[in-house]
Amino acid sequence: MPKVYIIDSPVPNAFATGRNPEHAAVAVTTALANALDKDEIEGVLAHELSHVKHGDILIGTIAASMAGIITTLSHWGMFFGGGDRDRNSSSSAIVGLAMMILAPLAAGIIQMAVSRSREYMADKSGGELSGNPDALADALLKIESYAKNRTMPGATENTAHMFIICPFSAKDMKQLFSTHPSTADRVARLRAQAKAMRSSGGAK
């Protein structure tokens, strides 16, 4: 069982970290503990434990690393690529510039797609684990209502994928490249899951 840590922060959020279940930890902020009720906190913890169970931390780290490598290689290709014959070619320069712009964008899109798919999976698995998808949906709405007005201190683009809700405020330009699906979509899926579980007698 991963250890659970409380981080002193004015912004409600949570994340899991660790390369595998044996070396993993889950962290929640003090603001989250104060803002959510018991069922909602259980839903958040179930979501994060699902990330641990499915190895999402390692997958997210690999995706972020690959995006960084692709970006770096595209920059190197611009400055060091091409033979002497093409070094002064305008067409070569145009291709190099296009690669420098498009490669990082493509890498970022791939990273976002991977991260978003893992968030959906963790929501579904977390709802099953807690037996209360509605509580997790309520938690996501509460966390976003706080987080959208304030960027979490210490949050970076390299760690954003780890959090249950994007740690950047709605005014932050980094929000445009969020690694998270829209909260509204996640909530809709969780509501549908809860309805299905109630129909089968499996939801709280």
PLM features: what roles do these ranges have?
Residues I94-G96:
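Anionic-ligand binding region
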